[in-house]
Amino acid sequence: MIRSLLRSFETALKLHAGLNMHPMHCSRRLLFSQYENRASPSRLTSSGTLGSNEAENDYVPYRQDRETGTKTRVLLEALRERFRFTDAELQKIISDELVHRCYRGRSLTLVMDTLQLEGVSRRSFVEYPWLLSLDNKRLELKMQLLKSMDFKDINHFVPFLRLTVPRLRKLVGALNSERDAMPQRNRVYYISEKLDVSPDIVSKYLSKRLFILEMPFEMFEKNLQHMIDYNVSPINVLKDLWAFRYTPKSVQLRLERAKRAKKDKIMPWMVRCPEPILQRSLKLSLDELKVLGEFSSVVEYLAHRLGFSTSEAKAIMDKHPQVHTVRVTKIKEVLDYLLDEAQFTRFEVAQNPRILCHSLKTTKERMEELKSHGCRPSSLVILCRSRREYDKFLQNWISHERNPQSVSEG
């Protein structure tokens, strides 16, 4: 009996040893393989020399086509290499809101290469940095639509790439429908020729006011001709295109009224502004003409009032350039008060031309206040100072023995 028990025990030991020779090693690999990945560099090196089977199981090859984003450094290097942008130009492109938003999730270099192959110039990338943020697939569709217009240069129509594909398709259809109506083939080139402005500048403004390209051609043509006939500056026409939404008759009437009032610069806003504003503007122009009289400019008028030559009067105004923007009616009122009522000399006015820009009401109030304290300022400087500086001067004057010589007027 004892012998049979010993034999059974030996058999069990042999069976257990046979089963545990390899499974223990495999289970250890399965349970603790995540810790083996943290092995030291020396162990990794040695394992590489022993065999590459284990390393190949964990290696994932790099695929460039899986990378969709563009690092800032890569984008900057690509821009420098292709266009030789200056640092200021690169900063303008990178700081653009759309570019900054998209460069991490989209390959902007691919879009840039596509646009470059289509002929988009260096200047267009600087003027419209958002071009880099366009979706490449939609960009191909947009380029096909623009090419159907037979343009002379893609850069003439770059601003329209910002439109959605359906909106651009509608716009291109409207422009192509007028091909035979004008020798210029479309309105962009028509406006460019009429105003003598580069097509790319025309597109820059028209892309923000698309109604110009879709409104009835007859109405558009007449309004444009009215602007030209009344010598409205081309750039002012492009900057304020809302005037084209009014009927040609009303546009002509408003421009004629401005011309009769002898406005030195007729602006498109005069067509669309409310009637009271137009009347006030025309009245101011007539008042200025009345003040100028025989003189053709504010410089000549100031020279006459102060008794200086025209060149001397211009030098006086140049000391404080803001004087050039002051209406001659205000200059007259200020000079009448300073020279006739306050009894300042022409030289005192010439030394401080800033007084011509200062509020006449404030000037009078300060003069009356100083006069009540027995102070007659030796110059006009203190009258133009800030409220805090003026109050400091006044308190300093009052605290002394009312001696003007003992008070510094700055």
Swiss-Prot record:
Pfam families: mTERF
Disruption phenotype: RNAi-mediated knockdown is lethal. Most mutants fail to develop past the L3 larval stage, and the few pupal escapers do not develop to the late pupal stages. Mitochondrial DNA (mtDNA) copy number fails to increase during larval development and instead steadily decreases. Increase in broken mTDNA replication intermediates.
Entry's localization field: Mitochondrion
Transit sequence range: 1-44
GO BP terms: DNA replication; regulation of DNA-templated transcription; termination of mitochondrial transcription
Mitochondrion among keywords: yes
Keyword DNA repair among UniProt keywords: no
Gene Ontology annotations for the cellular component aspect, listed alphabetically: mitochondrial matrix; mitochondrion
The family this protein is said to belong to: Belongs to the mTERF family.
Function recorded in the entry: Transcription termination factor. Binds promoter DNA and regulates mitochondrial replication and transcription. Transcription termination activity may be polarized with highest termination activity occurring when its DNA-binding site is positioned in the reverse orientation with respect to the incoming RNA polymerase. Required for normal topology and maintenance of mitochondrial DNA (mtDNA) levels. Regulates mtDNA replication by promoting replication pausing, possibly by acting as a natural barrier to replication fork progression.
Entry protein name: Transcription termination factor, mitochondrial
Organism of provenance: Drosophila melanogaster
